[in-house]
A protein has these predicted regions:
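C-terminal motif of bacterial Sec signal peptides marking the signal peptidase cleavage site
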Residues: 13-16
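Mixed-charge, low-complexity intrinsically disordered segments
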Residues: 48-77
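Post-signal peptide N-terminal segment of mature Sec-exported envelope proteins
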Residues: 25-46
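Mid-length scaffold segments of soluble, non-membrane domains
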Residues: 76-115
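C-terminal partner/receptor-binding element of secreted or periplasmic proteins
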Residues: 121-168
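Positively charged n-region of N-terminal signal peptides that target proteins for export
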Residues: 1-4
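Bacterial signal peptide processing site
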Residues: 18-21
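Extracytoplasmic
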Residues: 38, 81-83, 95-97, 135, ...
Length: 168
């Protein structure tokens, strides 16, 4: 019995490091991350009971922990919040890597990615080739992101779509 439990823990540890499917969302009721104030924060969870919080930011401030949620609902958008300064290499969506290169400000508004009919995420860029952002237009010139919130909108043409993000 102990061997089975040990094997289960070992498998859980290795699978948690991989890309996870985001199934639903809820609000935090309990967490185990030092130095964070997260109660009642909305989160997107990959497991009905627990979310492994593991950022991919390249920084000495990487945080890892477990979060329990009280309520669940069907996910409509996916938000990735990066609260420590660092470089974001890519967003992995069903094996499609997208390099982020946008100039950000602290406490910024979301940047939108749109899922096209083929299921590939595309950064929303206006007709002049700029990224509409905080009532300004920014060229894609930098990858230094002190605060990032990405919102992925599902294509309403597709009735069933799976949203997969690295970092959760």
């Amino acid at each position: 019995m102990k061997n089975i439990l040990f094997l289960f823990i070992l498998i859980s540890f290795f699978t948690s490091c991989k890309t996870r499917e985001i199934l639903s969302s809820g609000s935090i009721k309990r967490y185990q991350i030092e130095g964070e104030s997260l109660i009642n924060t909305e989160v997107f969870i990959t497991d009905p009971l627990k979310l492994r919080f593991d950022t991919l930011i390249q920084s000495s401030e990487n945080r890892r922990g477990y979060i329990d949620v009280n309520e669940q609902k069907v996910v409509e958008t996916v938000k990735v919040r990066v609260q420590s300064k660092g470089l974001v290499n890519s967003v992995d969506y069903i094996g499609k890597k997208m390099v982020l290169g946008v100039l950000f400000e602290k406490q910024s508004e979301p940047i939108y990615f749109i899922m096209n009919r083929r299921g590939v995420l595309e950064l929303y860029i206006d007709q002049s080739g700029n990224v509409p952002y905080n009532n300004h237009n920014f060229k894609m010139i930098s990858t230094e992101i002190p605060y990032l919130e990405i919102v992925i909108r599902k294509n309403k043409v597709r009735s069933v779509s799976k949203t997969v993000m690295t970092g959760y």
